Curated annotation (Swiss-Prot):
The protein's name in its UniProt record: Xanthine phosphoribosyltransferase
Family under the similarity heading: Belongs to the purine/pyrimidine phosphoribosyltransferase family. Xpt subfamily.
Species of the source: Oenococcus oeni (strain ATCC BAA-331 / PSU-1)
InterPro entries per the UniProt record, alphabetical: PRibTrfase_dom (IPR000836), PRTase-like (IPR029057), Pur/Pyrimidine_PRTase (IPR050118), Xanthine_PRibTrfase (IPR010079)
A GO biological process held by the record: xanthine metabolic process
Length: 206
């Protein structure tokens, strides 16, 4: 049965409004269902929504960054029946092989991380879908794109659970002519409340 993506978006928006906590002018805390505790039923629906939207792209890998991108990325890869890879933010003692790396600055934590993916897992010719929990300034996506380019693979699209439309990431992705799907698109924060874009889901897919 085909998923009603509009219903998934409505459920996601209601979750954000009822459980999300706005911090300052540009930070949204969604620890109760995405960034700390996970709502598996919602993540399953989100994965199905992304998989259906990008089903025509002949995807071979799904790529994200640890840790909050893992749940939606895994559910997407399950639907697409392809492997999911997460870039590590800290080099593990077990990651003693050759790897691709990139620098990613986190505006939320005010820190810069080196992210890494083993060269065994992304290959020339791979068609890679990027999935992440948030899109703000686009630094995480840029880092993943750098890794994909180093591997000689192709980025075929970007799927975002929650987009802060008022920050620079949206235009960054579109400037690279990449298909972008953001399920919940936030226009602004006002008096401690989330104001969603009147356009609803952001979808720029070829």
């Amino acid at each position: 049965m085909k998923l009603d993506r509009r219903l998934v978006i409505k459920i996601l928006e209601e979750k954000i409004k009822s459980e999300g906590i706005v911090l300052g002018s540009d930070i949204l805390k969604v620890n109760s269902f995405l960034n700390h505790q996970i709502d598996p039923f919602l993540m399953s629906q989100i994965g199905q929504a992304f998989a259906e939207k990008f089903s025509h792209e002949n995807i071979s890998k799904v790529l994200t960054i640890e840790s909050s991108g893992i749940a939606p990325a895994l559910m997407t890869s399950l639907q697409l029946q392809v492997p999911m890879i997460f870039a590590r933010k800290h080099q593990s003692r077990t990651l003693n092989e050759e790897f691709f790396s990139a620098s990613v600055y986190s505006y939320t934590k005010q820190t810069e991380n080196q992210i890494a993916v083993s060269k065994r897992f992304i290959n020339p010719g791979d068609r890679v879908l990027i999935i992440d929990d948030f899109l703000a300034n686009g630094q995480a996506v840029q880092g993943l794109l750098d890794i994909i380019n180093q591997a000689g693979a192709s980025a075929v699209g970007v799927g975002i659970v929650i987009e802060k439309r008022f920050q620079a990431g949206h235009q960054l992705i579109l400037s690279k002519n990449l298909p972008l799907v953001s399920l919940a698109s936030i226009d602004r924060f006002e008096d401690g409340q989330v104001v969603f874009s009147k356009q609803g889901e952001t979808s720029h897919v070829n």
